[in-house]
Amino acid sequence: MTDSNNQSPNKKTSGSSSAPPAADGRQENRRSRGEKRGGRRDRRGQERDSEWQERVVQIRRVSKTVKGGKKMSFRAIVVVGNEKGQVGVGVGKAGDVIGAVRKGVADGKKHLVRVPLTRNSSIPTLSNGRDGAASVLIRPAAPGTGVIAGGSIRTVLELAGIKNVLAKRLGSKTPLNNARAAMVALSELRTHKATAKERGISLEQIYS
């Protein structure tokens, strides 16, 4: 009697112990698949982020008058671009510099502008942009000229991927106004093909 009682629990335990390893194996497979998918998503996100470059144009300490007194914070002006015809200018405010820069980068990516580039990494036509009291004039240049501009205007043009251009600043010298004026000028650029289509003429008539 003692032998039969001792053997029956062993059989039950052996049968019950065989089920959990199979379930554990399935869970491990699911986890490994999820990790692979998550790894692919992370890689894609890193590749997208690696295409973009950020440059801080200005960091200022600003204050806001509230009921309890003055609240101090930092304001960062950031230019974001991929040097392939996309560029944006963003402004971020936070209690620390790092937070302000991060908000500026996020704001810049929300306000991207596509710039039509020529084979010589220049712009197709002359353009003028204005923001507040600042005015910026940009015109195409021959290969080897470089970026003839200064301040925040130069930063915007370089991150847009323009390598040969002439720019002139008129009016206000404020970095934010100049950067936004340059963005307005770039947003108004059109390719020769698009201009011909809008005017209803051929490309030969534009070049002539």
Curated annotation (Swiss-Prot):
Q: Does the keyword Electron transport apply?
A: no
| Occurrences of domain S5 DRBM (ranges) | 52-115
Listed Polar residues bias regions: 1-15
Q: Does the keyword Ribonucleoprotein apply?
A: yes
Cellular component per GO?
Answer: small ribosomal subunit
Q: Where is the composition biased (Basic and acidic residues)?
A: 25-37, 44-54
Region (Disordered) residue ranges read: 1-54
Give the UniProt record's GO annotations in the biological process aspect. Answer: translation
Cross-referenced Pfam families, in alphabetical order?
Answer: Ribosomal_S5, Ribosomal_S5_C
Recorded hits in InterPro entries, A to Z, give: Ribosomal_Su5_D2-typ_SF (IPR020568), Ribosomal_uS5 (IPR000851), Ribosomal_uS5_bac-type (IPR005712), Ribosomal_uS5_C (IPR005324), Ribosomal_uS5_N (IPR013810), Ribosomal_uS5_N_CS (IPR018192), Ribsml_uS5_D2-typ_fold_subgr (IPR014721)
Q: One MF term from GO for this chain?
A: structural constituent of ribosome
**Keywords, ordered alphabetically:** Ribonucleoprotein, Ribosomal protein, RNA-binding, rRNA-binding
Provide the function of this protein. Answer: With S4 and S12 plays an important role in translational accuracy.
The Swiss-Prot or TrEMBL note on domains reads: The N-terminal domain interacts with the head of the 30S subunit; the C-terminal domain interacts with the body and contacts protein S4. The interaction surface between S4 and S5 is involved in control of translational fidelity.
State the similarity comment.
Answer: Belongs to the universal ribosomal protein uS5 family.
Please give the subunit comment from the record. Answer: Part of the 30S ribosomal subunit. Contacts proteins S4 and S8.
Q: Name the chain's protein.
A: Small ribosomal subunit protein uS5
Q: Which organism is it from?
A: Prochlorococcus marinus (strain NATL2A)
